[in-house]
A protein has these predicted regions:
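A short, Lys/Arg-rich alpha-helix, primarily the initiator
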Residues: 1-26, 76
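Short, charged recognition helix plus adjacent turn
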Residues: 2-7, 69, 79-87
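Short alpha-helical DNA-recognition segment
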Residues: 25-52
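Hydrophobic micro-packing sites on short alpha-helices
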Residues: 33, 63-71, 78-79
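Short, basic-rich loop-to-helix N-cap that marks the start of a DNA-contacting helix
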Residues: 47, 54-69, 85-86
Length: 87
């Protein structure tokens, strides 16, 4: 059985992280998002969020969960799995 390999450069959620920040009223700055994630117990910096949004950094599963929680969106929406999912 052949193993399928997927080539993913960067990550699948960068654009959605940026959009999720912009949807907040007022919009969340990268610093604000990093602070929220730090308060949940995970180390995060503005630089990490910037690199995620620019597709320059991979995102681990635990980070995806924390990003979704901090942004108030579903994992499906954040990952672009379900285009119709409510954020």
């Amino acid at each position: 059985m052949a193993v399928k390999r997927f080539l993913v450069e960067g990550n699948i959620c960068g654009e959605r992280v940026r959009l999720g920040r912009a949807m907040h009223k007022p919009p969340l700055r990268q610093e604000d998002l990093a602070r929220e994630i730090n308060l949940m117990g995970m180390d995060m910096t503005k630089l990490i969020i910037s690199r995620i949004e620019k597709n320059q950094r991979h995102v681990c599963d635990a980070e995806l969960v924390m990003l979704a929680r901090a942004l108030g969106v579903t994992l499906e929406w954040l990952c672009g799995i379900d285009q119709n999912a409510n954020p």
